[in-house]
Amino acid sequence: MLKYNLKISSRFEHIHDGIASILKNDVPPEAEPIYMDRNTVYRLAINNTPIVIKSFQVPNLIDSYMQTVIGKSKSHLSYLNAKRLQKLGFRTPAPVAYGEVLNGNRLLRSYFMTEFIRGGDLRGWENNPDNEPLLRAFAAEMAKMHEAGILHRDFSQHPVYRHAGSRVQLLPHRP
């Protein structure tokens, strides 16, 4: 029998039904894929509220056990990390929700959702004529994180967002 775990931030309770539908029915076809690799990231508007959905890869049996019986799922940890980053004053998209679909103790699917923010990731940063201010902003943000006791473990191009100029935001999936 399937079990659904869903935690929604109070600020986003108005889209509860749409989020619950994702958990029960998977990401809807109208969601726009914006990043596809091991995990898939989608953009979707629910009741005119734009959100980002990270659909985590289905874990193997051992990882599933580790994420449900011994520890927390990646979606749950992402949600907690986002809350922690915000509490410490770091710029990160507001966490909307996390959800898990389980069959007994086996994790079948998990999702982490944040507010949608406009910007771009760091792909192609080396060809950007404004890359020095961007790199300085990135380094300053990392230094602040390290001073706060946070070691960000995912420096691939996707989890670091840049905005016009040199403002940097971190996606909270793996600090």
Q: Where do the language-model regions lie?
A:
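Juxta-kinase regulatory segment immediately upstream of eukaryotic protein kinase catalytic domains
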Residues: 1-31
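Conserved ATP-binding subdomain of kinase catalytic cores across diverse folds
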Residues: 20-120, 137-143, 147-148
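Active-site flanking residues adjacent to catalytic metal/cofactor-binding acidic residues
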Residues: 53, 153, 173
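AlphaC helix of the protein kinase catalytic domain
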Residues: 121-130
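Catalytic-loop of the protein kinase fold
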Residues: 150-157
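Catalytic activation segment of kinase domains across protein kinase-like and atypical kinase folds
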Residues: 158-175
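Active-site catalytic-loop/activation-segment of kinase and kinase-like phosphoryl-transfer enzymes
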Residues: 115-122, 169-173
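Short alpha-helical scaffold element within the canonical Hanks-type protein kinase domain
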Residues: 131-135
